[in-house]
Structure formats: C-alpha cells, structure tokens
From Swiss-Prot:
Chain residue ranges for the region called Disordered: 83-160, 378-405, 455-504, 550-712
Superkingdom of origin: Eukaryota
Coiled coil: 211-246
Name recorded for this polypeptide: Probable basic-leucine zipper transcription factor D
Native source organism of the sequence: Dictyostelium discoideum
GO cellular component entries: nucleus
Places the protein is found: Nucleus
Biased composition regions of type Polar residues, renumbered to the chain: 90-111, 550-595
GO BP, one annotated term: regulation of gene expression
Protein function: Probable transcriptional regulator.
Compositional bias segments (type: Low complexity): 119-157, 616-651, 694-707
Recorded name of the encoding gene: bzpD
Length: 834
C-alpha cells in the first residue's frame, strides 16, 4: 500500500508549527522564542526544523494538537546521562556531506533525523516489548479518548512512567562554546521497561489536576527567568557574530548550488525545492519572527528504502535537537486504532533521509581538485630572520650537546662494565693460581724428600773430582820440584845468590836508597861525551853503549811500526825479530814516536807464549883482552852452563804448556837475565816484551860509545821458580813495578809499564845490580848488605839503553869508585828523559 508522504510531512510540519505557537502562548514561551530564533540562524536547514527545544507543559506532556486531537500522548523523559559523553563532538559525515569541510561553530556534522513508520498490525500481538524511555508513542489521529483510558487501565504499575523531568537539569546548548546554557538534551535512552500490554501501555495519563499544573508552571517560570538572565548576557555577546556568520553561509550556499545538479528528492517535486529556497531567504530577512513561513524551512531530504527483512524492527524517526555534542534517537510509534477496526494497514517502510551539511563552502575548482584527488601543494615561505637562525643554531647546539652527553655516558658505562669484567676475570685467575701454587708446593715437598739422596750422591761426586784435581796438581808440583832439583844440581854455584834474593823488603829498600845516592852522583858528575871519544879516554877502562832498546826510525810512517834494537856492531838474525839498524855514530838528537803494542813480531814461533832470545856470547876475547884474570874465565863457563840449563828448561816448559795450558797471568810472569861475557866480541841483545794496546811517546838519545861486551839475555823461569833462583853473582836483572817501592820480577809487566808510562802515571824501575860491577863490594860488605844492591827509580821512560863495562883490572876498580864518573861503569844504566 502506497503511503502519501506529502500529507504525512505536512502533518508533521503543522504539528511543529502548533508547538511553537503554544510555547508562545504559555508562560514558557519567552525562553523558547529566544531559542527558536537561534535555531533559525543555524546553517543546517533540517537541523533548524527538527532540533528545536521541546517545551513541556505543567503535566510533562507535549501540547501537540491537530483538529482537537493529540498527536503525541507520551511524556518526554529526559535523563542527563553521563554515559552519552562519548557522543560529543561526533563529526561523522553523511553521504551528502561536503568532503574536507570542517564543522562550523553551530554545525558539527549532525545527521538528519529519520522518519520511521511502523505497521501497527503486529503491535497488538506483542505483549512484551522493550520501550525506550525517550520514545514518543504517536497514536492515530482518529483515536478517541476511550482507547486511551483503556490503555491506561490495562497498564500495570510498572508500565506507568511518572514525570521525570527536572527543569534544573536542562542544558541549553544553543551556543557551542557555552556549556552553562540550560537546554533540554534529548539523549539516547539507557533505562528500558518491559510492558505486558500492547503499544498502548507506553501512554501516560494526560489528565493532571489544574492546581498541580499551575504550581509546576510557576516553578518553571521562576527557573526559566533565572536561566533567561544568563542566556541573554551570553546571547547578546554572540548574536552579532551569529548573524554575520549566517549571512555569509547563506550567500555561499546560493553560489554553490548548480542548477545543472539534480538535488531533488525522488519523492518530492519541484515545488518542494522552491519552498525550501524561499524559506531560506525568509530566515535571513526576519530570523526572529515566529511566523508560519519560518516553520516551513524544510531541508533537502533524500529518502532511501531498506529491505523488508527488517520488518520485526521498530520503525523510528530520529529527531535530533540543537545540540552539537549529542545525538538522540526519538522513536515515533504510530498506532492505528480506528474504533477497534484495523481498516488502515500500511507496510513497514524505512525512510532514511540525509541532509547535506554545508559547513565550509568550496568553489567549483576546489571541489574538482578534491574529487580528482590531486595533492595540494603548500608553499612555506623561507624565513631569513636572524632570530630564527639563532634559534636554529641554538637548537643544533643543544642537540649536539645532548648527543655528546649521551655518548659520554655510554662510554663511561662501557668502561665501567669492562673494568668490572676484568676484575671478575682477575679474581677468578687469582683463585685458580692460588690453587695451583698450593698444588705445586705439595709437589715440591714430595720431590725434596726424593731428591735428598740424589743430592748427597752429587756432593760425593764433586768431592771426588776435587780430590782428583788436587792429586793432579800435586803431581805437577812434584814434577816442577824435580825440575828445580835438577836445576839446583846443575847450578850449585848459584845457591848463595838465590838465598840472598829472599831478603826482606826493608833490607831491599835500604839498599835501594843507598844505590840511588851513588847512581845519582854518577849521573850528575858524568862529563859530556863527544862523537869521536870513548869512555876509555875518561877512565882507565873503555865504556860504550851496546843497545838502543825500544827506539824507532824517523822514516817509518805506516801505522804499524816495528820495534828495533840497535847496536854498534851486531844485529840479530832475520828470522828472530824485525829490526832496523841505526847508524853507529849519531849525534845526540831527540825523536818523538809512538810505539804501538804490536812492535815486536816473532815470525818463527807465533803460537808460543814464551819468547826466548838466547844470545850466546862464546866469542873469545883473547885477542883484545890479554889482561883478563881467572874470574872472567869462570864467568864465561858459568854463562855457558846457564844457557844450556835455560834451553833445557824452556823445552820442558813448552811441553808442559802444550799439555796443561796455564792462565794468562802465569804466562805473563817473566823476567830477563842479562849475562855478562868476558869475550871481546860484540853483539846485539834485544829485550823482548809483550806490549799492550796503548802507545807511549819515546825519545831516543844516542851517544858515542866504545866497544862493550855483548850481554846474553835469556828468559828465566816463572814466578813460582823465582823464589829460589840459581843465579850467579855476576848476573843482572831488570825488575819493574807499577807502584813505588814494590819490586816486580815480571818482564812482560815491566815492558808494558815502560810503554804505558806518562807524566801522570810514572813508572818505578828497580835495578838489581851486583856490587862487583859498581866496585861497591867493599862498602857493601862493610855495611853487611851482601854482594848485590837494588836501585829503584820512579820516572817516565822515553828511551832505554844498556851499557856494558869493559873488562878492566881489579886494581883499577878500587881507584875508580870515588871518581865522579864511576857510575858509568855500572852494568846497566837507565838514562831517562823527563
């Protein structure tokens, strides 16, 4: 069955218009007029029509009447429920809402109400239906009072709902920014009641005593007056703004409507649209007049029909009041009671009407851009202000500082963690090492007991080795003693002289002092010698130098300079030493040379540690010296014997040295013998020395000499054998030492000391001279010193020469002693250059 929608809409509009008229007539109309005027100023047309505040009468019933019949017989049950706060600021857009449009001050995307019509054929059969508290039961227009009375009588005490309206709880929210305005909020219902009767059980008695109504009206008026005073103050402030806003919105709406776009409803004709536009224009001219034209500001309604499968659901109409934060659903139930006859039956249809909410109107180009989904380019103008740059730099510094602080904290944290880890590792290692130490100590104690026996055995072995070594040393010593005994047997004549050498140092020191006196006298009183004269011209006997020891020629410029031994007549063989002869007759000159340590070279026997120079003076002096006595003959015989013994001893020593090499200190402990010969032949006798690594500066002085005897220089035995040497009284020794008044018998040490001597480190030379050679045997015998004396001199040696006396008669010797030149007849005279 088709429904006449135009008639039904007209009925609703007339009912709304009558509501406003009744509000103006009663005492509550003053406040409602103001609210109604505000509602007409809204930009949403449908919202202005259906969101007006509901004014309740004194009996809490709606005064809607049409042809003396009540349209709505139920009460508005208003409940300020806080649970509906989640519905605030719900800006959900409708299908016809303009995209990307922000809600205005009075328009927050509130959906348009829904008009739902129910078929009442099934309502009588349903006895237990849940009725919302905020639902409005709409009875049929032709229903009479009898049906209402029956429904009231059939309703139980539980179905009867008293007036729950509290005027103080009204919240007037016409103005969005002000929550203090008392406005009746139509919220969604929460409390539901079950009825045992049909839909007529939801109706409430409309008849209330007139006295009660008057009292309620007076109370409402008093409360409304207080509220009006507050509203007037707020509305006066914002009324001007609202009017301007509404005027601008209306103009934009007119410009945005394109006549080419079909905005008409399928159920509405062109006349309805024209009426809407006319009503919109009338609101802009006279918004506050409560005329009938303002009541017909109908919105553009589009209705859609849903499927009939939802026939069991109640048809409802959503009536949304003028509250931007809440949405209330008002269900209008329509019951057809035509005198108990269900003559009019209508199908259940749902009409979903949505209204386009115009909030922020856009131009055609903007709408096309939005429809095309083109991105909007926003240009941000660059700022070149110094303040902005400073702020940016400041922020960068702050960011860097924070980053650095964070990094430092992280590093510190990591460092601390590493330290803790190392500490834990070290403690673990320490504990493990302690355990190992204890274990090793136990092993040491165990092994100590086991090794005690082995140590004792090793000590015994060492003692046995020491005993064997001592035995070997004793055997060697016995061999040496045997050699000494053999030497003693061969040299019986020299026993007396060896015993005299073992005198104490004090006696030697006294003899040295005495000889020093005589030697100095002889040196100072010696006359100068010419190149053509000899000592024989001065004294009754001739004296001439025989050797110039440790001198070098001027022609040698190479770094390796060899030592030469010069004499007036004879030189050594080529195989013995590298020598360079010197002219026999030279003037007294001084030459300064450096003597290296390798001045002497032995080409024949380089591996031997002993240098043996045996000069055998076996020449007979019978042709030259006929006046020699028996003493000279005896001396020759003794010299020959000594030479033979020395050769034998040297051969034995070489063999022992090859078998048992001794230390360097033993090898260097040597001395030189100077043997006088009675022969008249002349020869050279070099002194041999082991020089050190250093050099000394020497000067050679030559004098005119006569033909002396050639001494025989031979190497003596070691120091161990020197203690009791078998030397003849005629033999002479050169003994030297590094420190004064200490006599040395080592020829190697003597030679090195001679070469290394300088002004800061002078050398001390001690001469062990026989008394007979100095003709002092009588004086020495008178003193009781023996046949020999010692001369000790501390000096820097630059040149050494050995003077050998000529063979003279004993008679002449006694007369020469007091002479000034008697010291020149000494067996060995050292001339020193200071």
């Amino acid at each position: 069955m088709d429904i006449d929608y135009e008639n039904e809409i007209s009925i609703v509009l007339e009912a709304k218009h009558n509501q406003h008229l009744n509000n103006n007539n009663n005492g509550c109309g003053n406040a409602n007029n103001i609210n109604n005027e505000n509602n007409f100023l809204q930009d949403d047309l449908v919202y202005n029509f259906l969101s007006d505040e509901v004014t309740l009468g004194s009996d809490c019933t709606t005064p809607y009447t049409l042809n003396n019949n009540h349209i709505v017989n139920s009460n508005y049950i208003i409940n300020n429920n806080n649970n509906n706060n989640n519905m605030l600021n719900d800006h959900s857009s409708s299908p016809m809402r303009v995209p990307n449009s922000s809600p205005s001050l009075y328009n927050n995307s509130i959906e348009s109400p829904e008009l739902v019509y129910h078929d009442n054929s099934n309502n009588n059969n349903n006895n237990n239906n849940n009725i919302n508290v905020n639902d409005i039961n709409v009875n049929d227009i032709n229903s009479n009072s009898t049906n209402n009375n029956e429904s009231n009588n059939n309703s139980s005490s539980e179905g009867e709902l008293p007036c729950l309206v509290d005027i103080q709880q009204y919240q007037y929210q016409d103005m969005l920014p002000f929550d203090q305005q008392p406005v009746v909020v139509m919220q969604n219902p929460i409390i539901t009641t079950t009825t045992t009767t049909t839909t007529t059980t939801a109706t409430i008695e409309q008849q209330i005593n007139p006295s009660e109504q008057q009292q309620q009206q007076q109370q409402q008026q008093q409360q409304q007056q207080q509220q009006q005073q507050q509203q007037q103050q707020q509305q006066q402030q914002h009324q001007h703004l609202l009017q301007e806003h509404q005027h601008v919105v209306n103009e934009e709406v007119l410009h945005m409507i394109d006549p080419s776009v079909d905005l008409t409803n399928t159920y509405m004709d062109a006349a309805g649209i024209s009426d809407i536009i006319a009503s919109d224009s009338s609101t802009t001219t006279s918004p506050s007049s409560p005329s009938t034209s303002n009541m017909f500001l109908t919105p553009m309604v589009t209705t859609t029909t849903t499927s009939e499968t939802s026939s069991s659901s109640d048809s409802s109409v959503n009536i949304i009041p003028n509250n931007t934060n809440t949405i209330t659903n008002i269900l209008i139930k329509e019951e057809d009671t035509n005198n108990g006859n269900n003559n009019k039956k209508s199908k259940k249809r749902t009409i979903d009407s949505r209204v386009q909410n115009i909030v922020h109107p856009l131009t055609r180009e903007e709408l096309l851009k939005i429809a095309g989904k083109e991105p909007v380019q926003v240009v941000d103008p660059p700022t070149h202000n110094q303040e902005d740059e400073r702020n940016v730099k400041k922020q960068r510094r702050l960011i860097k500082n924070r980053e650095s602080a964070q990094l430092s904290r992280m590093r510190k944290k990591i460092y601390i963690e590493d330290l803790e880890k190392t500490i834990s590792d070290l403690t673990q290692d320490n504990s493990s090492l302690k355990e190992e130490v204890l274990y090793l100590q136990g092993l040491v104690k165990q092994l100590a007991a086991q090794n005690s026996n082995s140590n004792n055995n090793s000590v015994i072995d060492i003692n046995n080795n020491n005993v064997n070594n001592s035995q070997q040393q004793q055997q060697q010593h016995q061999q040496q003693q045997q050699l000494n005994n053999s030497n003693n047997n061969n040299n019986n004549n020299n026993n007396n002289s060896t015993n005299k050498q073992q005198q104490s140092k004090n006696v030697k020191a006294a003899g040295v002092c005495l000889l020093l006196i005589f030697f100095s006298l002889g040196v100072f009183f010696q006359p100068p010698q010419s190149s053509t004269q000899r000592f024989g011209a001065i004294t009754s006997f001739d004296v001439k130098p025989t050797h110039s020891i440790l001198s070098m020629s001027d022609s040698e410029s190479s770094p390796q300079k060899s030592l030469r031994l010069s004499s007036n007549h004879h030189s050594l063989p080529d195989g013995t030493f590298n020598t360079i002869p010197i002219d026999q007759q030279t003037t007294a000159t001084t030459n300064t040379k450096s003597l290296p340590s390798y001045v002497l070279n032995n080409n024949d026997d380089s591996d031997s540690d002993y240098e043996n120079v045996n000069i055998n003076n076996n020449n007979n002096n019978n042709n030259n010296n006929n006046n020699n006595n028996n003493n000279n003959n005896n001396n020759n015989n003794n010299n020959n014997n000594n030479n033979n013994n020395n050769n034998n001893n040297n051969n034995i020593k070489r063999k022992q040295h090859q078998q048992n090499p001794q230390s360097d200190s033993f090898q260097n402990r040597k001395k030189i013998k100077i043997n006088l010969a009675t022969e008249n032949t002349e020869g050279d006798g070099p002194l041999v020395s082991k020089s050190s690594a250093t050099t000394t500066t020497t000067t050679t002085t030559t004098t005119t000499t006569s033909t002396p005897k050639t001494p025989q220089i031979s190497e003596d035995v070691s120091i161990d054998e020197i203690e009791e040497p078998m030397v003849h009284s005629s033999q002479q020794y050169i003994v030297c030492s590094d420190s004064p008044r200490i006599v040395s018998n080592n020829i190697t040490q003597t030679t090195e000391s001679l070469l290394n001597s300088n002004s800061t480190n002078p050398i001390t030379i001690g001469l062990l001279l026989p008394a007979e050679s100095l003709n002092l045997h009588n004086i020495v015998n008178n003193i009781g010193g023996g046949e020999r004396s010692i001369l000790e001199i501390s000096c820097q040696v630059s040149n050494i020469r050995v003077w050998n006396p000529l063979s003279i008669d004993i008679d002449h010797q006694s007369s020469i002693v007091p002479a000034s030149s008697s010291s020149s007849s000494a067996s060995s005279i050292f001339t020193n250059h200071f």
